[in-house]
Amino acid sequence: MSVRSQALVPLSTEQQAAWRAVAETEKRRHQGNTLAEYPYAGAFFRCLNGSRRISLSDLRFFMPSLTAEELHGNRLQWLYAIDVLIETQGEVCLLPLPGDAAERLFPSVRFRVRERSRHKSALVMQKYSRQQAREAEQKARAYQALVAQAEIELAFHSPETVGSWHARWSDRVAEHDLETLFWQWGERFPSLAGMERWQWQDMPFWQVIAEASLAAREAGHAVREMERWMVPNKLREAA
């Protein structure tokens, strides 16, 4: 396909946003401006729909079926993959992006990379700072460590005391991660048997926590006492 014939094909909204993201980010880089983390990904969504903070809804542009659980622990990998995709103009498409992401934004990529092997992609990837990759990994690991710590602490709570756990972690761990931990933890407590996650999906999480505490109080002394004995000894000894 000639350059002229490619130019005659109108660009879709998302393709225009991708090319604008490349142009704007390269301009800022050449001007010596400080770039934010994952600048190409940020510029793409800003040009596409005005998003200043990339959300789950934004990432569903690439995978409509993406859930909060699937994104859990993988957000940085998604942002990194999108950043690489835009900067390389579709030549490098990393997981977890779907295989058609490159052609969706840069249709001409199939003509540019048809004769290139994965070895070429690896060479392109070498221009990215190893330090940046390490920092991203360290941030991801640090966050996962926080989530793990929150999960461990939750194990030492009963529905009576879960409110204090939420207060401690609500500003340190993402709400969707706290929700996942809570619903998994709550499955073993009789006082919470009547609470189904789907019934509360549109309610603020703090209200779910409040309802859990209320359910424990209304369950009766015998149930509360049993649930206290269901948690590890550390909580009972500290009480």
Curated annotation (Swiss-Prot):
Keyword tags: Plasmid
Top-level lineage group: Bacteria
Protein's organism: Escherichia coli (strain K12)
Signal peptide feature range: none
Pfam families in the cross-refs: PsiA
Similarity field: To PsiA protein of plasmid R6-5.
Official protein name in the record: Protein PsiA
Function: Not yet known.
